[in-house]
Amino acid sequence: MEACCSDLEVDINGEQTIFLNKQIICAYSGTLRKLLGKSTSSSGNLKVIFNDFPGGAESFEFVSRFCYNDGRVAVMPSNVVFLHCAAKFMEVTKVLEQTEKCMEEIRYWAWPEVLLCLKQCQEVETSPEVDSLAAKLMDALVEKLCLTIEMSPSSAGSACSPDSSLFRFSCDSKSTESFKNCSVRLTWWFDEVLVLSSGLVEMFLKLMVLRKFDNLIISRFLFYYQKVKFCSASSHEKRKILETIIDTLCVLDRSCVPCKSLFAVLRLALGLNINKSCMNKLEVMIGHQLDQATLDNLLVPSPSKSSHLYYVNLVLRFTKAFLDGARSGLQLKKVSSLIDQYIAEVAPDPCLKPSKFLSLITLVPDSARESHEDIYRAIDMYLEAHTGTTDGEKLNLIRTLSYEKLSGESRAHISRNQKFQAIETLDEQQQQQQQQQQQKQLILRMEKVETSGENEKLKEHIEGIQWRVMELERACLKMQNQMEVIKKRSKSSSKGSNRSLPKLCS
């Protein structure tokens, strides 16, 4: 283009300066027409600076070529994102019409074309328009992936699982090779998706779950995603990645999420201070699979602010989450045994308070423990390491033991154990106090019974007196009536007689 015709200078995000003809570019761009106004016909060069142009200089050049080519441009998957965003910014309606028409065919694009467009979306500054375009592209990408997996000869993810019958019962080299090929067919897309930003990966995962994609494959991808991305991510990015992983794992089938992997995520999460909501979800997931955990899994170091050697509160929360769910007797016994091992491990911790130690002992129901041997040894170790424990605190710990669940050797050891002598004396005193209190209550109850009996007799006596009074009143009334009759008869028969009968009743 001739230099004399280039009367408009455009600075694109400080990356590049492009010289254009004002009349040509303004004929198509509504944005530049508004900016330049009447100056389009004036003499002299003008300069426009764009600091937030979507897609940068490359995107601007796409639109410029359209303007200089009499409104013609080849819109294709490789340039549609930049063209669409630039046309939206520059208000070039003719380009927008062509890009929107092109995007109507997204579902027919090849996988690499859709993935390329998504990569271009993350290069453009975020806006509602870009987000909407990315959502359409991501929906198409997930749809293609689902169709590809369904059409695969080994589409069922469980068939390639190490826990499946295919893997369990076929250990020869041929079947192992078959398993590897199956795994590759189902996970080929892992590295390709990892080129996307964490925000787009999160969108991808939500759509995968929504479409009920194989949970085992999603789980494998999540742990692979964490492993690869953590190598170069900042602390903030790591936190974001972990939160996305946890939010996705908690909606997957529990059987598809290995317990060991959850503990690996936990150790990372504790070091990154992820948000409380995600941490709670992770703790509940681990709690639901606590019967599959090992002692090493539970021996998590205490946070730096705490003086404890191990994170006891964390184990308390795990166990609570386990007990809140419906569990079989076998699972409960496994967890009970695991907690007893943990108690023995943390008992020597000099900073572990008696109340916290007692909480651990009483954490699982007593019915889950067939023996109290491990608990007794743990209590003995605890009292050995905590010489300042009061007799009352010791008594609370000893009372958790069921002597029926102790061996004869342990019972004999208790009777000889110097640490328990003061406890026995205190226990006897408390039993005496309880007996005295029970005797007082018995006396009070007896006194109440005696008082109640006397009151009953008095009541009967009063009722008898009232009955006799009523009988006398009726007899008196009857006699008065009879006297009235006698008086009337005596007046009529003996007229001259002044003698009256004595008054019997008034």
From Swiss-Prot:
Similarity annotation: Belongs to the NPH3 family.
Role played: May act as a substrate-specific adapter of an E3 ubiquitin-protein ligase complex (CUL3-RBX1-BTB) which mediates the ubiquitination and subsequent proteasomal degradation of target proteins.
Coiled coil: 421-492
Keyword Coiled coil: yes
Residue ranges of every copy of the NPH3 domain listed in the record: 187-435
GO biological process, one term: protein ubiquitination
Domain commentary: The BTB/POZ domain mediates the interaction with some component of ubiquitin ligase complexes.
Pathway assigned in UniProt: Protein modification; protein ubiquitination
PROSITE patterns: BTB (PS50097), NPH3 (PS51649)
The protein's name in its UniProt record: BTB/POZ domain-containing protein At3g22104
Keyword Coiled coil: yes
Alphabetically ordered keywords of this record: Coiled coil, Ubl conjugation pathway
